[in-house]
Amino acid sequence: IHENTILQEIIEKLQTDTVKDEKAAVIQESPTVSMIFHGLSYMDNLCMSLSRRIGNIWKNSSIRGSIRREYESLLGEEVFDMKVEDLSERQKYQLIYSRVMLQNPQIVYCIKPFKGADLAHRIHIWKLLEMLLDRGITVVDISLNLSDSLSLADRLLMIEHDGTVREIPKENFAFVPRNVPWRTFYRGSKNEVTGRY
């Protein structure tokens, strides 16, 4: 089985299982395309993950005003009055990660968070992931790119085809080959999932 097949199976499982769980969130691959709800306001996009927790979030101007005041310093005042279609790529990333922070899950699964991002956006994404970690939220980076993943991780989990999991602590990252594919590193066909707990 190819690494991408295993990765796809993990992603599909996460997307179906975490939908019902407030304590878990998924940041999808290419989130500025897949997680922005066009036609909705910036505030509606930001509050999307709260609808299960706060039943009347859409009509409660008091709660929405409080959220705006709390997040203005992080997001900027101007974005709240912009159409989501007019946001910059950076502002879209900020919106998505702020939505997750507002949800306040215990764990966030990030599917290929750096895929397709240029250097400036990679740095911005890395800082946003650090913000989640600083809030005590566990971040699991589901990727095939070890270089990006290991910069944030405090351990590496190798999942073998038979489901066996091998953990590599941060102090042993220097021995992990960075070249692709890593078949020589694996005993069987595996995929890697990194996370910081």
Where in this protein do the model-derived segments appear?
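Conserved H-loop
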Residues: 136-142
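ABC-family nucleotide-binding domains
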Residues: 111, 117-118
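Helical segment within the ABC ATPase nucleotide-binding domain
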Residues: 122-135
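Conserved beta-strand-loop-alpha-helix hinge in the C-terminal portion
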Residues: 163-190
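Hydrophobic anchor residue at the start of the ABC signature
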Residues: 97
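ABC ATPase nucleotide-binding domain signature region
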Residues: 1-54
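A short, surface-exposed alpha-helical micro-motif characterized by mixed small hydrophobic
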Residues: 149-151
